[in-house]
Amino acid sequence: MNRSNIWNLLFTILIIVTLFWLARFFYVENSPVSKLSYTSFVQMVEDERSVVSEVVIRDDGVLRVYTKDGRVYEVDAPWAVNDSQLIEKLVSKGIKVSGERSGSSSFWINVLGTLIPTILFIVVWLFIMRSLSGRNNQAFTFTKSRATMYKPSGNKRVTFKDVGGAEEAIEELKEVVEFLKDPSKFNRIGARMPKGILLVGPPGTGKTLLARAVAGEANVPFFHISGSDFVELFVGVGAARVRDLFAQAKAHAPCIVFIDEIDAVGRHRGAGLGGGHDEREQTLNQLLVEMDGFDSKEGIIVMAATNRPDILDPALLRPGRFDKKIVVDPPDMLGRKKILEIHTRNKPLAEDVNLEIIAKRTPGFVGADLENLVNEAALLAAREGRDKITMKDFEEAIDRVIAGPARKSKLISPKEKRIIAYHEAGHAVVSTVVPNGEPVHRISIIPRGYKALGYTLHLPEEDKYLVSRNELLDKLTALLGGRAAEEVVFGDVTSGAANDIERATEIARNMVCQLGMSEELGPLAWGKEEQEVFLGKEITRLRNYSEEVASKIDEEVKKIVTNCYERAKEIIRKYRKQLDNIVEILLEKETIEGDELRRILSEEFEKVVE
């Protein structure tokens, strides 16, 4: 039996004993007793219908009289102790007679009867208080900070070697490490370290990992808390937790305080319908005060992470608070390769695994995606009973992460399977032929994920940060290649192109309304995203143009999509023979890799230009 079970058993026993003594004390000691004169007592005894059932004669001259209906009386009659006639009369009436000694023992019994319940009550109360003040109870720690403190040590210590794909951010954070290690170096020349550092970047880019790496490099305590941990139902709790957090930080300085998802508490004040959330605003106000109230020379660095810096309160971002902002971008190809090396260094890899190729095939993946990819590949290898992770495992893992797990058991009729094959082959052919099309890495007609009956995987040759009008038009044409193939080959269209049409329409509308790529409307932006209601979630789109312009926008969007669709059908008709060959191979193999696809298309294909 472990310690907690023993304490629970003792607690139960204490409760039972306490209840027993309390019942005895209140029932016996406080039972209703009435005084009765000796004359009335004699009359009750001599009455033919006597209700007396028992008489207890005590040596102190007190008679305790019990009636048949449960009432109790006391009679003061000192002479009754030696009155033999009274005793004979009681016996003759059939009344039970007994004696009772009243002395020191009775006194101590009364004392113990009072003290024992009191002592037991105190013991139980202390036990309850001890339990409530335990580490996992919130009754007495409701206003305490929920921050978790990590002390870098041993294998759990995270350093910059454990972070990949964020070299610029690491360079910016190295001076923070130097300050935490040797503050006097900066104090001598009057330099002030930023009180707050805001890490900005999409989810999964490693913002929390960077903060822990700074603490690990400087070998200082690391306080981690989420912005949502401050705000509670009761007003004032969040502000109290902020005060407690900074009190703990000052006690462990030098240290790092890291607030994850700070937008949960740091949103613009006064935003929203009906005013702001009083508790959140009080918490934010207290955070602002605390960041003003400590000196950066104390060695406390406040770091925070968010993927929505645009909704943060301006007072939080002014110099003297979060005055240093570091952008953590998604990694490029070299960054992805380094991240893969970090996540695979303790995993057995087969000789055919090429991390550079995997990095090229995962554009847009952030650190969290790549870690999940490596883990998925390891799970696949373990499922197959292999001792090492092969390149095939990584290829399948990429497909599973992008499109979902294969559903090979899903039954599809031969007719629908052929339609799906032409649809996916249409995407591949058009994307290969257009001048700015992304190279096709794989096409498959194996159903995956929730809805996908097939998919075409593109592999960009490099990471791109700008996109031209012609590139967008080529992308639109490739998106509509599947539907174009259905119409050209079967003379009919299916619902399989619904998502392609939705994406194509969205791209075309953005070209017209946001990017100024419409020949008819010119380089103007039409419409404005309305975000003033809740600051952080788009509610509607402000229409700042006339009905005539709205009609022209719709015409331009339709024109762009229609032209790209006609262009896609033209490509399908021109390369119908190659399309049919790809479909036959696809129906046989169900999956065609990019090299084989390009070999089928061969070098004589000319790029189609408008």
Swiss-Prot record:
Asked if the Swiss-Prot or TrEMBL record annotates the protein with the keyword Cell membrane, the reply is yes
Q: Which residues form the active site?
A: E424
Biological processes annotated in GO: protein catabolic process; proteolysis
Q: What's its top-level EC category?
A: hydrolase
Sequence intervals crossing the membrane: 6-26, 108-128
- Which Gene3D superfamilies does the entry link to? 1.10.8.60, 3.30.720.210, P-loop containing nucleotide triphosphate hydrolases, Peptidase M41
Q: Which residues take part in binding ATP?
A: G164, G204, T205, G206, K207, T208, L209, H343, E371
By its UniProt entry, which SUPFAM superfamilies does this protein fall under?
Answer: FtsH protease domain-like, P-loop containing nucleoside triphosphate hydrolases
Q: Which UniProt keywords apply?
A: ATP-binding, Cell inner membrane, Cell membrane, Hydrolase, Membrane, Metal-binding, Metalloprotease, Nucleotide-binding, Protease, Transmembrane, Transmembrane helix, Zinc
What result follows from mutating D500A?
Answer: Complete loss of protease activity
Report the membrane topology from the UniProt record. Multi-pass membrane protein
User: What does the record say mutating G404L does?
Assistant: Complete loss of protease activity and of oligomerization
Q: Name one GO molecular function term.
A: identical protein binding
Cofactor, how bound (note): Binds 1 zinc ion per subunit.
Indicate the quaternary assembly.
Answer: The isolated ADP-bound cytosolic domain forms a 6-fold symmetric protease disk and a 2-fold symmetric AAA ATPase ring. In the absence of nucleotide the AAA ATPase ring also forms symmetric hexamers.
What is the documented function of this protein? Acts as a processive, ATP-dependent zinc metallopeptidase for both cytoplasmic and membrane proteins. Plays a role in the quality control of integral membrane proteins.
Put simply, this protein is called ATP-dependent zinc metalloprotease FtsH
The lineage is: Bacteria, Thermotogati, Thermotogota, Thermotogae, Thermotogales
